[in-house]
Curated annotation (Swiss-Prot):
GO terms for cellular component: cytoplasm. Belongs to the glucosamine/galactosamine-6-phosphate isomerase family. The gene is Gnpda. Its EC number is 3.5.99.6. Pfam families: Glucosamine_iso (PF01182). This is Glucosamine-6-phosphate deaminase. Gene3D superfamilies: 3.40.50.1360. Catalyzes the reversible conversion of alpha-D-glucosamine 6-phosphate (GlcN-6P) into beta-D-fructose 6-phosphate (Fru-6P) and ammonium ion, a regulatory reaction step in de novo uridine diphosphate-N-acetyl-alpha-D-glucosamine (UDP-GlcNAc) biosynthesis via hexosamine pathway. One of its GO terms (biological process) is glucosamine catabolic process. One of its GO terms (molecular function) is glucosamine-6-phosphate deaminase activity. Keywords: Carbohydrate metabolism, Cytoplasm, Hydrolase. The keyword Cytoplasm applies. It is found in: Cytoplasm. Homohexamer.
Length: 274
């Protein structure tokens, strides 16, 4: 596991975007060789998406031969609802780049058979050859996607009933009306993300500092699902200074010392492996 500590959340977005661009370009995707990218929603990756859009406009990266799989979607929310993850992804990223619509995969929370929808999603990932790079964010309780505390660490894509804390946190997006907040979601499982060749997790803000501490300094624990990625062969966590507030000083010094030995602009994928 590698932890990259940067000064601000803006720096995290820029660093992550540069890394994604480099991974895609180094892969040299083409008509018979697609780069498969797993993507999150939420406020944390917005900076990364904005930077990737700029790189695309500058001709530095193309998404023509990229296939994407999003982490999750609410159940029962219309696709054109402003809080649906379909709307989020098209509004904040996809409509600004050259990705083909048929190469975008987002779970359908309005499917007549939700279990079949989840199983189909897993099959689509397999048919695409597996995910090269899965990007995620975490919540203050260490959940990744909608794999909330207590989730199985070998779980697959499934229907998930959301915890009360999550419902209350999401109420701000629905006029603070709890009756409007979706009670269920479709989500990739921890095991689904673990199958990816590489995982990059973005963590920003002091409110996520304890979750980062649990992910880095303590053992694997299903009550902190992000901790499962200690056991992934190629995990990269990118955080800002605020997110390190619960880490030991020597832990911060250790990872900062490693980063100093790597030129950010020329960092290779192998440079981030254990």
């Amino acid at each position: 596991m590698r932890l990259v500590i940067l000064e601000t959340s803006q720096s995290v977005g820029k660093w992550a975007a540069k890394y994604v661009m480099k991974r895609i370009n180094d892969f040299q995707p083409g008509p018979n060789r697609y780069f498969v990218l797993g993507l999150p929603t939420g406020s944390t990756p917005l900076g990364m998406y904005k930077e990737l859009i700029e790189f695309h406009k500058q001709g530095k990266v193309s998404f023509q031969y990229v296939k994407t799989f999003n982490m999750d979607e609410y159940v029962g929310l219309p696709r054109d609802h402003q809080e649906s993850y379909h709307f989020f992804m098209w509004h904040n990223f996809f409509k600004h780049i050259d990705i083909e619509p048929q190469n975008v995969h987002i779970l359908n929370g309005n499917a007549p058979d939700l279990v079949a929808e989840c199983n189909k999603f897993e099959e689509q990932i397999k048919e695409a050859g597996g995910v090269e790079l899965f990007i995620g964010g975490i919540g203050p309780d260490g959940h990744i996607a909608f794999n909330e505390p207590g989730s199985s660490l070998v779980s697959r894509t499934r229907v998930k009933t959301l915890a009360q804390d999550t419902l209350e946190a999401n109420a701000r997006f629905f006029d603070n009306d709890m009756s409007k907040v979706p009670k269920q979601a479709l989500t990739v499982g921890v095991g689904t993300v673990m199958d990816s060749k590489e995982v990059m997790i973005l963590i920003t803000g002091a409110h996520k500092a304890f979750a980062l501490y649990k992910a880095i300094e303590e053992g694997v624990n299903h009550m902190w699902t992000v901790s499962a990625f200690q056991q992934h062969a190629n995990t990269l966590m990118i955080c800002d200074e605020d997110a390190t507030l619960e880490l030991r000083v020597k832990t911060v010094k250790y990872f900062k010392g490693i980063l100093r030995d790597i030129d950010e602009g020329a960092a290779t994928q192998d440079g981030y492996k254990n």
